[in-house]
Amino acid sequence: MTRRYWNINLKEMIEAGVHFGHGIKKWNPKMAPYISAKRKGTHIINLARTARFLSEACDLVFDAASQGKSFLIVGTKKRATDLVASAAIRARCHYVNKKWFSGMLTNWSITKTRLSQFRDLRAEEKMGKFQHLPKRDVAILKRKLSTLQRYLGGIKYMTRLPDIVIVLDQQKEYIALRECAILGIPTISLVDTNCDPDLANISIPANDDTMTSIRLILNKLVFAICEGRSLYIRNH
């Protein structure tokens, strides 16, 4: 994996509040190597470690994107839904930002069937086929389509399992991480001071509660993916 410079600087991370962890009573002892201090009852994350692992993650996604690999971004925290969608669309990644359904990856054959139904319904609506149906049937189909769009809209073009999964909240997306571990899919995860850094292939110690922190980390990763995609296009 080629090491590159991703313009990750301390001042920017401090301004975004990346260094603020949880209260000292809520910590996971496995996070001790990533904590630099305690301040007013709160653990402070070591930003030198954040920069190191964020840089490693950027290198990984750049290399993967330059080879045409696919990505899935998972972040179902309500405040982050729009951020996840816009970042994923910008980098041409799949995303889940509403709810992670258990078995979404491990029961891929079922997920694939649902996605096929979703695409068929969208096509039928666009072609005007709903117009020839009774109003009651149209209402049922539109409700079904709306539900599918809400929960599967971010993965509607996903035809196979992703090559890399990026998780923005380890505790909230624990099931997604476990499914990736079972399937051997590499994962990148933000880990706050109450998380387990051993659950992902690359764990980035960072505040996973503040939007400015999540945005900064995600934007760095998305930039690296976009750079990798550009290289892939130039070479093909």
Swiss-Prot record:
Gene Ontology terms: cellular component: chloroplast; mitochondrial small ribosomal subunit
Keyword Membrane in annotation: no
Principal subcellular localisation of the protein: plastid
BP-aspect Gene Ontology terms: translation
GO molecular function: structural constituent of ribosome
Record bears the keyword ATP-binding: no
InterPro entries the UniProt entry points to: Ribosomal_uS2, Ribosomal_uS2_bac/mit/plastid, Ribosomal_uS2_CS, Ribosomal_uS2_flav_dom_sf
Subcellular location: Plastid, Chloroplast
One Pfam family from the record: Ribosomal_S2
Highest rank taxon of the organism: Eukaryota
Alphabetized UniProt keyword annotations: Chloroplast, Plastid, Ribonucleoprotein, Ribosomal protein
SUPFAM superfamilies (alphabetical): Ribosomal protein S2
HAMAP family, per the entry: Ribosomal_uS2_B (MF_00291_B)
Assigned protein family: Belongs to the universal ribosomal protein uS2 family.
Record-given protein name: Small ribosomal subunit protein uS2c
Species: Agrostis stolonifera (Creeping bentgrass)
Gene field: rps2
